[in-house]
């Protein structure tokens, strides 16, 4: 398994797609910060060029990395069945479970690289270009990131699992959007009327990372409290576990 993990590390970290994705994420963040700075220079009394506004705005968009987790999952397994690379791995005697788990491990490492670069650029750029609102908003952003990481990993593993279930890049993406985004969104809407749906939605990944409640002070997120933070972690770990089980089941039944 170690050798296969090394080969996957080499493959993913020597492909342009990872660096294009990371660069695009960093560029979007810097353009956002740069736009706020430009507005503060050319607009009188522009009050949004602060780290409070910038960091809180991006903390309110934690569902965007969930979509990006599907992109990362696709990078890890894209066209593997089409070009028979999965067949070659199995033919060399690598157990199917190890193939899947190795891709999960390397996908987590690649995701960590992308996240580290992007968040470092965000925080550094925020302090360089914008008015410093204090450490509280930086810590809140970091706390939100930590709370959502398990959910993002679950999103990546879900795409990888669905690829082996469907055998198609396009089909796996559509099914991912259905079960990760569409169905939980509908459940969340029904939760406005039915208590059971509200309780169920509170454990689903997409509503959990996208829920934002305006307050008198500023914004409140699911992870703002200790109990909410723990619940986000638990939901993410449950999602990871379920989709790993699904992925192993699917890869075992996949014909060569």
Can you say where each PLM-predicted feature lies in the sequence?
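Secretory targeting signals
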Residues: 18, 22-76, 101-170, 176, ...
């Amino acid at each position: 398994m170690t050798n296969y993990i090394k080969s996957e590390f080499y493959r993913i970290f020597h492909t342009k797609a990872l660096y294009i994705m990371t660069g695009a994420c960093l560029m979007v963040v810097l353009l956002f910060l740069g736009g706020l700075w430009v507005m503060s220079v050319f607009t009188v009394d522009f009050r949004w060029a602060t780290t409070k506004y910038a960091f809180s705005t991006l903390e309110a968009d934690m569902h965007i990395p969930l979509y990006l987790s599907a992109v990362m999952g696709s990078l890890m397994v894209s066209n593997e069945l089409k070009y028979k690379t999965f067949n070659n791995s199995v033919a060399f005697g690598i157990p199917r479970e190890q193939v899947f788990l190795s891709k999960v491990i390397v996908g987590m490492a690649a995701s960590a690289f992308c996240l580290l670069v992007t968040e470092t650029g965000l925080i550094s750029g925020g302090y360089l270009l914008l008015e410093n609102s204090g450490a509280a908003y930086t810590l809140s952003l970091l706390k939100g990131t930590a709370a959502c990481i398990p959910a993002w990993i679950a999103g990546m593993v879900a795409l990888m699992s669905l690829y082996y279930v469907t055998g198609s890049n396009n089909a796996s993406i559509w099914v991912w959007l259905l079960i990760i985004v569409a169905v939980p969104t509908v459940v969340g809407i029904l939760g406005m009327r039915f208590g059971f749906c509200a309780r169920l939605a509170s454990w689903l990944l997409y509503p959990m990372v996208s829920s934002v409640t305006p307050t008198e002070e500023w914004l409140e997120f699911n992870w703002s409290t200790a109990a909410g933070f723990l619940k986000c972690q638990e939901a993410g770990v449950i999602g990871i576990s379920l989709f790993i089980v699904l992925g192993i089941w699917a890869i075992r039944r996949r014909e060569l």
